[in-house]
């Protein structure tokens, strides 16, 4: 643990594997707007990694108001939370996450979360997974509408930890998250390969490391 002074976690797809719940929620929204679900092709081209308001614009074929975007964005997240709670078998942090939190605490290494989730979802995660046992909820960086991109979110999270991004280890799962972590100045990035897209990662030096959390990951380190 001597190669970094702090840790910044992404959340969705990193500490909590929840992608199927997002797909179900968007499918329900699509049914309400278009009266049919979403195809696999649409999912990859118009949904994955796309902000809620852009997805809703797509579902309305560009003909929607700001009020409709707000309404359906909040409704989608409500459906998402309901689907999470209904599936008790998968509604938990990834195996070993809390042990890793404890290990960081015991080594006096500060850590927090930088997530693109909105505040109601963050509150939902804190309450459901008792994240406040390890992290001050006020220190969690989330999408409050003020961040231009996740680069700024990573920088804010590092600032909260009292560190430079270059002194942090960032744990991510998405290709855009990996790229933004690098652009923010991080050179130690752990990738949780929950989407099985390891071969699509940027061309960097890759070092396999033993997982402290009991789930598969690999380390991307940039010279």
Protein language model features and the residues they cover:
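N-terminal helical cap/lid subdomain that shapes the substrate entry/recognition surface
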Residues: 2-95, 107
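Conserved Rossmann-like nucleotide-cofactor binding loop
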Residues: 14, 21, 119-120, 176, ...
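Helix N-cap/beta->alpha junction signal
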Residues: 19, 95, 115-118, 174
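Substrate-recognition "cap/lid" segment bordering the active-site pocket of phosphatases
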Residues: 90, 112, 118-169, 175, ...
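Short amphipathic alpha-helical segments and helix-helix/interface helices
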Residues: 98-102, 178
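Short acidic-hydrophobic, aromatic-tinged amphipathic segments that line or gate anion-handling sites
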Residues: 141, 207-219
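Acidic, Mg2+-coordinating phosphoryl-transfer loop and its flanking beta/alpha structural elements
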Residues: 170-208
